[in-house]
Amino acid sequence: MSQISRDEVAHLARLARLALTEDELDSFAGQLDAILTHVSQIQAVDVTGVEATDNPLKDVNVMRADQTAPCLTQEEALAEAPAAVDGRFAVPQILGDSE
């Protein structure tokens, strides 16, 4: 039993402003019909007594211990920079007016 017609696919394509060829309309009609068939099968599953959930994983704010690690000094970080001003990287301005 077909759940979606070629004309319905054409209508959806127009709403989405998609230019589909005749072959694409036929192909997508079949694909969407298969998807809707699977959705119907899922909807038919008896879920009586199953608690609704939006996320089965209840891990919230999982933290790790802070650990220090070696890093570059400010001088080492700026050593290869094309330009630096007041101990910071200097980059060309890309937004707004210069001050």
Curated annotation (Swiss-Prot):
The keyword Kinase does not apply. It comes from the Bacteria. InterPro entries: Asp/Glu-ADT_sf_sub_c (IPR036113), GatC (IPR003837). One of its GO terms (molecular function) is asparaginyl-tRNA synthase (glutamine-hydrolyzing) activity. Its EC number is 6.3.5.-. One of its GO terms (biological process) is translation. It catalyses: L-glutamyl-tRNA(Gln) + L-glutamine + ATP + H2O = L-glutaminyl-tRNA(Gln) + L-glutamate + ADP + phosphate + H(+); L-aspartyl-tRNA(Asn) + L-glutamine + ATP + H2O = L-asparaginyl-tRNA(Asn) + L-glutamate + ADP + phosphate + 2 H(+). The keyword ATP-binding applies. Belongs to the GatC family. PANTHER family: GLUTAMYL-TRNA(GLN) AMIDOTRANSFERASE SUBUNIT C, MITOCHONDRIAL. Allows the formation of correctly charged Asn-tRNA(Asn) or Gln-tRNA(Gln) through the transamidation of misacylated Asp-tRNA(Asn) or Glu-tRNA(Gln) in organisms which lack either or both of asparaginyl-tRNA or glutaminyl-tRNA synthetases. The reaction takes place in the presence of glutamine and ATP through an activated phospho-Asp-tRNA(Asn) or phospho-Glu-tRNA(Gln). This is Aspartyl/glutamyl-tRNA(Asn/Gln) amidotransferase subunit C.
